[in-house]
Amino acid sequence: MPLTVNCPICKTPVEWVPQSEFKPFCSERCKMIDLGDWASEKHAIPVKSEFDLDALDELGYDEESFFKE
């Protein structure tokens, strides 16, 4: 008996077999909806910020003088 997973978009059961062309999605439509969600940044991979915002505050710049220099 093959493994069955739910489509991440519509929750339709999908058999995890080589014949399942769009796995883990049930269809091209659900695959494209997911791609659109990534492209519009509805999904994102969390990463640690490169910047320490507290350290930036310690530099002593205020917004007005920073842009005038």
Swiss-Prot record:
The keyword Zinc applies. Keywords: Metal-binding, Zinc. SUPFAM superfamilies: Glucocorticoid receptor-like (DNA-binding domain) (SSF57716). One of its GO terms (biological process) is regulation of DNA-templated transcription. One of its GO terms (molecular function) is zinc ion binding. Gene3D superfamilies: Erythroid Transcription Factor GATA-1, subunit A. Its cofactor is Zn(2+). Transmembrane segments: none annotated. Zn(2+) binds at C7, C10, C26, C30. It comes from the Bacteria. Binds 1 zinc ion. Inhibits all the catalytic activities of DNA gyrase by preventing its interaction with DNA. Acts by binding directly to the C-terminal domain of GyrB, which probably disrupts DNA binding by the gyrase. Belongs to the DNA gyrase inhibitor YacG family. Interacts with GyrB. This is DNA gyrase inhibitor YacG. The gene is yacG.
